[in-house]
UniProtKB/Swiss-Prot annotation:
Cellular compartment(s): Cytoplasm
Source lineage: Bacteria, Pseudomonadati, Pseudomonadota, Gammaproteobacteria, Enterobacterales
EC number: 2.7.2.8
Pathway(s) annotated for this protein in UniProt: Amino-acid biosynthesis; L-arginine biosynthesis; N(2)-acetyl-L-ornithine from L-glutamate: step 2/4
Family per similarity comment: Belongs to the acetylglutamate kinase family. ArgB subfamily.
GO MF: acetylglutamate kinase activity; ATP binding
Chain's role: Catalyzes the ATP-dependent phosphorylation of N-acetyl-L-glutamate.
Catalytic reaction annotation: N-acetyl-L-glutamate + ATP = N-acetyl-L-glutamyl 5-phosphate + ADP
Binding annotation for substrate: G44, G45, R66, N158
Species, as recorded: Shigella flexneri
Example of a GO biological process term: arginine biosynthetic process via ornithine
Keywords: Amino-acid biosynthesis, Arginine biosynthesis, ATP-binding, Cytoplasm, Kinase, Nucleotide-binding, Transferase
Protein name as catalogued: Acetylglutamate kinase
Entry superkingdom: Bacteria
Length: 258
């Protein structure tokens, strides 16, 4: 089996029918013409934010990571492993793709520990066992994995989806594409940066050009590139016609170098 490609979905993609239609059409085209197995990893920040707003619960973030108190982890699990995951499975079904919905704890695919007590139920993801997902891929399934994990003590944890995708890529020896709302990392003039090294990222963070959630994304991509020993792409889902080329390894956004 060829080494898999993990496509991490994020941003408002899950909220946009047009975007999901474009993405799944591109996935169908890719799967028809390529043998390479695909895995989707997703968060669902926008789904969670909407739910929190509806329930009048505050959304707190620390260094770009969502603070998840004990009384909110069940709600967030429902939103990510439930609503967001099953929405993607429904789109797969609509496009005749045989998909399986998972969370990080299934088959111990990604090991999760608590990241920081101050963040509450927020997990640190580390590589786990490839057995379950490899067996699904060998049988032609598309695994769709939510970024909810579970500790060895049985505590549910909310994991940053970029970091979850990185850990799963390390588990499977997979290539990784982080799809988001932006077409890559932008410089101070709003121009896309084609390639990024750790030194350049540090410089842009110091200058305040890379901020908030993008810091988490860039650090996750740098961590992934280092861990995997291969480049990681950050790109946009907005340009559907470019997606098959992107899945083929053509750089379309910002390529993060190890």
């Amino acid at each position: 089996m060829m080494n898999p490609l993990i496509i991490k979905l994020g941003g408002v993609l899950l909220d946009s029918e047009e975007a999901l239609e474009r993405l799944f059409s591109a996935l169908v085209n890719y799967r028809e013409s390529h043998q390479r197995p695909l895995v989707i990893v997703h968060g669902g920040g926008c789904v969670v934010d909407e739910l929190m707003k509806g329930l009048n619960l505050p959304v707190k973030k620390k260094n770009g990571l969502r603070v998840t108190p004990a009384d909110q982890i069940d709600i967030i699990t429902g939103a990510l492993a439930g609503t967001a995951n099953k929405t993607l499975l429904a789109w797969a079904k609509k496009h005749q793709i045989a998909a399986v919905g998972l969370f990080l704890g299934d088959g111990d695919s990604v090991k999760v520990t608590q990241l920081d007590e101050e963040l509450g139920h927020v997990g640190l993801a580390q590589p786990g066992s490839p057995k379950l997902i490899n067996s699904l891929l060998e049988n032609g399934y598309l695994p769709v994995v939510s970024s909810i994990g579970v500790t060895d003590e049985g505590q549910l944890m909310n994991v940053n989806a970029d970091q979850a995708a990185t850990a799963l890529a390390a588990t499977l020896g997979a290539d990784l594409i982080l799809l988001s709302d932006v077409s890559g990392i932008l410089d101070g003039k709003g121009q896309r940066i084609a390639e990024m090294t750790a030194a350049k990222a540090e410089q842009l963070i110091e200058q305040g050009i890379i901020t908030d959630g993008m810091i988490v994304k860039v650090n996750a991509a740098l961590d992934a590139a280092r861990t995997l020993g291969r480049p990681v792409d950050i790109a946009s889902w907005r340009y559907a016609e470019q997606l098959p080329a992107l899945f083929n390894g053509m750089p379309m956004g910002t390529r993060i170098l190890a």
